[in-house]
């Protein structure tokens, strides 16, 4: 399996429509170019996951994430600025410019602005959105072992962005911005 340490090399892999095992703040992620529908479907197939289950979007900056949202109240923007960058995914209403394939049926997106330097560097080099999901088979536990993840997703279209995960040992918290309720803590 190919491994990249350079954000530019990993970014080029994503631009080719390929899949990347990547570090996050917590568990290993599986990601691709958010605008490449066939790459998104490939991730669903690799994970044995339903096509109608949406992915988390990773944005390179708070301003990029805000550009994807429907109109927000000042208090909502202040909340986002207080949790991002960070290990928090937020569900919010999407604007109309975003592809319907990235939105849930209720026109929402799940989005995060990471504070983990390797993923931030990758997103800045890529200069776009990635979809991301935990690197495990659907409904099975996540693994913190890169070797195990590489065995599970051994495929010629999958490579590794070889940097360490952050210190969190679990997936990100998920908060619904409309209700301010935790979906996952």
What are these regions (language model features)?
Residues 1-185:
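Active-site-adjacent structural elements in enzyme catalytic cores
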